[in-house]
């Protein structure tokens, strides 16, 4: 359920709304079943896999939700799965469970009408070695295939061609909302916070769907009714309307973001090492904020000739902490 508070839109859910909940390590902590938790709608960051003319092939930078691949245990492929209908907002004729997703779906929640109009329909292969049927589809939103993440084609998108290889580019964390919905995160120190995410290709048989695990491996898959696997949508977008998108930086081969960081100066607090907040009306406040932004955002040296020399500047959650030499 989406609501607005002080002009900002939030998604409100409680534990009963989650796809999966548990007290085991790696799960979101709910205090009870009924208390609502609020999650702010933010712009989705997309990883660019390929650009062809004005069309960009995009993959969500994080897992955005937790959903079953299919709502019932049965032999299934992408074309008749419930996750395909949920992603695109299809009616009951498009999935084996005859469930209508025209009102509650990912596309309506994630995109405005103008944004949705810029998403192109892609021919999506229903490729499988596990079933005799093959029903390719044309969808705006889809899941990546095993071929796109772990074969020769995968190299074009920045992934290892070896599905059993330890691949930083395939590893993924989730949004906080996705974790609340049920994604199970790795709680070990190494690769902490990574989660599983669905591929559309069947796994060891048609009762399983392939996935990417905590460490970037693509194996035999997970049962299609699993509730703790994350959804990482992919799409092809027309880039000609530049008002609909903005550059968000780059990502390195070790999955480290090099973002264009933005800070709202009106929201920044300034706190010295004695935890004393500096008045926003003072010259000191403006000076130190800009010195901190110069150091952390633009990677510039602090100008030591401006008044006292400052060191140990740190930005955390819209607060700047600092100390003098």
Where are the regions a protein language model picked out?
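Collagenous Gly-X-Y triple-helix signature in extracellular proteins
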Residues: 1-297, 307, 313-322
């Amino acid at each position: 359920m989406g609501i607005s508070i002080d002009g900002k839109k939030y998604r409100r859910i409680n534990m009963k709304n989650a796809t999966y909940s548990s007290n085991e390590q790696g799960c979101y902590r709910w205090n009870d079943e009924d208390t609502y938790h609020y999650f702010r709608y933010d712009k989705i960051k997309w990883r660019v896999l390929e650009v062809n003319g004005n069309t960009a092939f995009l993959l969500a930078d994080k897992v955005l939700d937790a959903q079953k691949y299919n709502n019932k245990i049965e032999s299934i492929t992408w074309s008749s799965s419930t996750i395909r209908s949920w992603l695109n907002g299809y009616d009951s004729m498009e999935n084996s469970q005859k469930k209508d997703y025209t009102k509650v779906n990912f596309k309506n929640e994630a995109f405005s009408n103008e944004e949705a109009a810029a998403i192109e329909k892609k021919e999506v292969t229903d490729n499988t070695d596990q079933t005799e049927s093959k029903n390719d589809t044309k969808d705006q939103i889809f899941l990546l295939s095993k071929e796109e993440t772990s074969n020769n084609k995968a190299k074009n998108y920045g992934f290892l061609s070896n599905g059993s290889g330890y691949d930083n580019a395939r590893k993924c964390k989730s949004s906080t909302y996705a974790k609340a919905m049920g994604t199970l995160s790795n709680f070990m120190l190494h690769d902490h916070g990574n989660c599983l995410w669905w591929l559309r290709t069947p796994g060891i048989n048609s009762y399983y769907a392939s996935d990417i695990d905590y460490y970037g491996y693509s194996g035999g898959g997970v049962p299609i009714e699993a509730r703790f696997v994350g959804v990482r949508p992919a799409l092809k977008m027309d880039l000609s309307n530049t008002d609909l998108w903005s550059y968000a930086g780059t990502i390195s081969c070790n999955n480290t973001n090099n973002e264009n960081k933005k800070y709202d100066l009106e929201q920044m607090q300034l706190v010295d090492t004695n935890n004393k907040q500096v008045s926003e009306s003072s010259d000191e406040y403006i000076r130190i904020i800009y010195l901190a932004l110069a150091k952390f955002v633009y990677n510039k040296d602090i100008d030591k000739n401006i008044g006292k020399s400052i060191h140990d500047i740190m930005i955390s959650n819209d607060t700047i902490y600092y100390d003098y030499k």
